[in-house]
Amino acid sequence: MESQSQQVTGQILTQIFNLHQTGTDNQPGDAKQITGYCEPLSLRAGEQIQWFGSSHVPTNGRLDLVRLECGDPTRSGPGFSEHPLDSVSPLDIELVEQPLVPGSFAEAILPADDPKNVSVGFWFQPTLLKRDGVIASMQSDDGFIEIFNQGDYLCGRFGGAEFRLRERPLERRRWYFLHLDIQLSDRRVTAKVATQRSASPARDLLQLGEDTKEFEIPAIAFNAIVFRLAAGIDGSRWDGRIAAPEIVIDDATHIWSFADDMESAVVKPISGDTELAFYQLPARGVTGPHWNGEHQRWTEAPDQWDAAHFHHDDLYDAGWTPTLTLDLPEELPSGIYCFRYQGDAGTDRVPFFVRPAATATHSDIALLMPTCTYMAYANHRMLIEGADFVGARNNLRPEHQYLAEHRDLGLSHYEKHPDGSGVMFSSRRRPVLQLRPGADGWNFTPDTDLNAFLTHLEVNHDIVSDEDVHTEGLAALAPYRVIVTGTHPEYWSTAMLDALEEWQRSGGRLMYLGGNGFY
């Protein structure tokens, strides 16, 4: 039986869910089929933009560009308003599904010419043992090897043969060192698994035992080896931390340190000449097996913060094929625009922000779109969790229903990965369902109310984004006498704050219209 508080909460949530009723998009009860994103999110008139579209069912439709004056369809708002562009001709486009493949991993492609011996070693710390995953794999045209957890147990797959590499179960958040000596010529493997630290960082490093096992394996031949960490040959992913990987192929040694090249997705080798690349942005600069608890940031002791934390649901870049590449007209006015796709399976709008062309005249006023905040909340599922709590999921709009059914869209900073760790990265290189007209009651939609308000007052204004200020600094703000914030300018980088303070010292006037800002 529902408590009175649950009933009241349910009534409030139902009102929130029913706020956004518009005939321009899918309605509650409809199944959302079409989605997409664009790159970049903010650009100047005359620059190039790409739109990436996908539909779960093949659909024919028309794509056009609209200038969005107001994206708020609520009864209390000024009214939804958009204007198709005459300067960009609509296109008939057939959409098919472009899959999402989340999950971070690392990869190096290593030279090999039918080696006799291969040895592999690395530290690993499982963080989600209830889910099976491949910790490391080696693949060639003529064979493969996978190291994986099957529940609590560490196992190996060598060609068609599987073995348990350690009889004792693994423990979550405990560091282990695995060393495999693979004698391909003799078809034998020696596996050593050492446990060198407790689950508590406050304790000293201890030798807690080593397990050694030998196996006879099927014949495996390697030419070039695709060496992956946290990924299998079939694309499966793993949750946990890995540090200090090394692989020796006959006499060629390859070693990498994840404490190096922290600003890059590619790690140069300590030994050998093959780089190792990260995909879907695992968390870097996290504590490794030798962290002693004395240092609280990676810059103080990089050799102790030398691990990468992989998650099966990390998503930095959807990696879709561009559906359309477009050069915007030079004379396009600054404003909020959308790619609008109207097809047999529904309608989807993907917003983007246009600044004046580099040679164009600027307005005196700019509306600063808080895109950093949009990204922090991107694809958040807070309303979904609230709806589940009170049994009101049927009241969700299609965008939220879609998010509930598609965790492969990635997470926001307001969620946790299934292993309990926080979400470090939130990206715009994926469909962001709340970055849609009318999709949410805060962030983007009410910011379009401000745009409509200024337009209604016939106040000439340009659009600038957080990303522009972070990238260009003072130069992005300098043309303007007045900056108007969005309704929720919550997240600011140091570069943004420095630029804003310098702009104000030079005489700029800031109109803060936010209810939660400048953290």
Regions found by a protein language model. Give the residues of each.
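Proline/serine/threonine-rich low-complexity linkers at boundaries of modular beta-sandwich domains
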Residues: Q6-Q33
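Short beta-strand segments of immunoglobulin-like
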Residues: C38-L43
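Extracellular glycan-associated modules
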Residues: A45-Q50, C70, T74-E294
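Short, hydrophobic beta-strand segments
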Residues: W51, I182, W320-L332, V354
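Aromatic-Pro/Gly-enriched surface loop or interdomain linker
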Residues: P58, L68, G285-Y316, G346-A476
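Aromatic sugar-binding surface patches on proteins
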Residues: V88-S104, Q304-T325
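Helical hinge/lid and interdomain linker segments adjacent to catalytic or ligand-binding clefts
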Residues: D313-Y316, T325-D327, E331-P333, A439-Y519
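Short, aromatic- and glycine-rich surface loops/edge beta-strands on solvent-exposed regions
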Residues: G335-Y341
